[in-house]
Swiss-Prot record:
Signal peptide: none annotated. The gene is ybeY. Coiled coil: none annotated. It comes from Francisella tularensis subsp. holarctica (strain LVS). One of its GO terms (molecular function) is zinc ion binding. It comes from the Bacteria. It holds the Pfam family YbeY. Its EC number is 3.1.-.-. The keyword Cytoplasm applies. Its cofactor is Zn(2+). SUPFAM superfamilies: Metalloproteases ('zincins'), catalytic domain. Single strand-specific metallo-endoribonuclease involved in late-stage 70S ribosome quality control and in maturation of the 3' terminus of the 16S rRNA. This is Endoribonuclease YbeY.
Length: 168
């Protein structure tokens, strides 16, 4: 199933061929709106690919050399030479999400599934905008921004429980 969801000048192209369960698409569009507003982006388009655990494991192995399923992988758009800026600047990239991984994580972490979806989607969008978490400083910047954006959606800090478990 392919579907385009549009709000003003923001688009999410949903690719969900196996029809995996996903939350309300409006929730995800609201996440894109928040991230776009925060970064003063007036036009944006994202491909959201919903895949099985096996598919994301293959992608994770191919692009990250990690032979296991993960919740999300983001691919920032690299503008091909010759593509006009007005077209290239709108497309942020591709996000691949495995719903089964998200469901397991939400259960393990006692989180509402829709809250976890929104968190992980925002996380992926931030990767498309160049944020990363390769070191503690980058992680702190990215996590703080996620916490701030999620608070605007009425979602509690997703890192509190993890911080308590990790002794941070």
């Amino acid at each position: 199933m392919k579907r385009k969801l549009k709000m003003d000048n923001l688009n999410i192209n949903f690719i969900n061929d196996d029809e995996h369960p996903i939350p309300s698409q409006d929730l995800l569009l609201k996440c894109l709106q928040l991230v776009a507003d925060k970064h003063h982006i007036s036009h944006a388009e994202v491909n959201l690919n919903i895949v099985s655990n096996d598919e994301i494991q293959q992608i994770n192995k191919q692009f990250r050399n990690k032979d296991k399923p993960t919740n999300i992988i983001s691919f920032e758009f690299e503008k091909p030479q010759g593509l006009p800026d007005d077209i290239a600047n709108d497309f942020l990239g591709d996000i691949v999400i495995a719903p089964a991984v998200l469901e397991n994580e939400a259960k393990e972490q006692n989180k509402e599934i829709n809250d976890h979806w929104q968190h992980i989607f925002i996380h992926g969008l931030l990767h498309l905008l160049g944020y990363d978490h390769q070191d503690d400083q980058e992680a702190e910047v990215m996590e703080n921004l996620e916490i701030q954006l999620l608070a605007q959606l009425g979602i509690a800090n997703p890192y509190i429980e993890q911080e308590n478990q990790n002794g941070r």
